[in-house]
Amino acid sequence: MAKARRRTAPRREVRTTGEFERWLGGLDAERKAAVAGAIGRIAHVGPTLGRPHADVIHGSRVRKLKEARVDRGMRLLFAFDSNRNPVMLLGGDKTGKWTRWYPQKVRLAERLYLDHERSIGKEAQCLTQRGVGRTSSQMSR
């Protein structure tokens, strides 16, 4: 009788942008630990990670753009690149800026993602028409 093989998760290399690194550097130890936990979950689960931990940003030109919900208003915008590695694009706290945060940050995240794809020799093939950058939970309201 053949032994059942255990499936192991593919090894993913987490990538970060300078924008993300600068933001992360300004956080206290407790928030950095929360961000590290979110990144670990993203890397372990992969592109299928969904709610309540992550949600797709609808209306973005980058189909793969998602947000991770770290705590209350803290969000990470990320995407999986053409090599299926998670790219942490930027982070921020949208507390008190609920409607203004997304349009500004989504545009920046799109640019950072396209820059990343070019840097690894890929031309992003995941562009759609620009929208306003809303999560699925916002669209259902």
Where do the protein language model's features map onto the residues?
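Basic, Lys/Arg-enriched alpha-helical interface segments
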Residues: 1-74, 82-86, 93-141
